[in-house]
């Protein structure tokens, strides 16, 4: 059957595995990451000081031998993991995230509390040296009595093109280089016409997976633009519910899209009305018809709508 995460054909047993979502370090002292190129979906968003954290969502992790380095949770990441009904693994958390980590709907696992086994590698300094394996994470799910399989009525968050041939958008903008606007790590993607993938760069060099030795590459890139609010201490406050605009990049083109996400609850303990939702974000074209995504891996950027002009779509 087809993967719920990539739209590609995979083994039936793997297709109904509950995904594992891992909070990846993305500061230079923690690079290179290990295993992240095998993630089916990667989320990126800012935390304090403009530094970005990545969250890799894995379903087919049979050939993943190392995952890391793992860092602490920020409040909006468990809700991004919940969009894929994933179990979410982190190592520590911000004070604001602590408000949500006991929610059983979010299936969170904190290595700092001993929720899963890990190792501290000697080739990096703390806190940039926490690594683990998929086997450790699955064992943690079993020990916590979290099902390792999705429900039979599970519905994929994204709607994929049924054909392996990419959809052509003649009216879309040509996009060979996509500059994300994340200034701290100067992150951008470059399109390779030969294989139809976007290759990731940051900190002035290709972003390499230590485990494979390969540069990270994806078929699709989605931007979800959200209000750039802040908590009282200046930490980013990103509310993922409501509606807004976004960007879809694939197969050498880019087009502006729309998104919406339902509210399931409101938390008033964080100095604001923090709206949250467990369900997936719905992406649509400008005419409100559902976005059809090309088969393959997807990188999703959570980005402040006020900084939209910093996203650069370049034709070379």
How should these model regions be labeled?
Residues 1-41, 48-316:
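A surface/extracellular/periplasmic glyco- and lipid-processing/surface-interacting theme
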């Amino acid at each position: 059957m087809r993967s719920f995460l990539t739209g590609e054909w995979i083994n039936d047993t793997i297709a109904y595995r509950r995904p594992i979502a891992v909070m990846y370090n993305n500061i230079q002292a923690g690079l290179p990451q290990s295993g992240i190129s095998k993630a089916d979906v990667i989320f990126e968003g800012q935390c304090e000081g403009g530094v970005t954290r990545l969250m890799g969502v894995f379903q087919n992790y049979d050939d993943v031998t190392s995952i890391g380095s793992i860092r602490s949770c920020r409040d909006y990441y468990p809700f991004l993991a919940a969009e894929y009904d994933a179990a979410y693994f982190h190592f520590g958390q911000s004070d604001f995230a602590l408000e949500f980590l006991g929610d059983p709907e979010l299936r969170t696992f904190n290595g700092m509390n001993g929720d899963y086994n890990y190792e501290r590698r000697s080739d990096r300094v703390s806190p940039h040296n926490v690594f683990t394996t998929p086997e450790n994470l699955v064992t943690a799910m079993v020990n916590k009595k979290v099902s390792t399989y999705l429900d039979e009525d599970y519905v994929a968050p994204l709607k994929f093109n049924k054909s392996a041939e990419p959809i052509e958008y003649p009216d879309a903008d040509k996009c060979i280089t996509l500059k994300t606007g994340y200034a701290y790590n100067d992150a951008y993607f470059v399109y390779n016409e030969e294989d139809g993938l976007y290759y990731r760069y940051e900190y002035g060099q290709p972003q390499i997976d230590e485990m494979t030795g390969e540069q990270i590459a994806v078929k699709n890139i989605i931007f979800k633009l959200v209000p750039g609010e802040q908590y009282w201490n200046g930490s980013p406050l990103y509310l993922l519910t409501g509606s807004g605009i976004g960007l879809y990049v694939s197969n050498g083109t880019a087009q502006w899209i729309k998104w919406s996400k339902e509210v399931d609850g409101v938390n008033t303990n964080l100095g604001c009305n923090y709206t949250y939702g467990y369900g997936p974000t719905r992406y649509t074209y400008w005419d409100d018809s559902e976005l059809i995504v090309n088969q393959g891996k997807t990188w999703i950027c959570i980005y402040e709508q006020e900084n939209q002009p910093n996203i650069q779509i370049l034709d070379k």
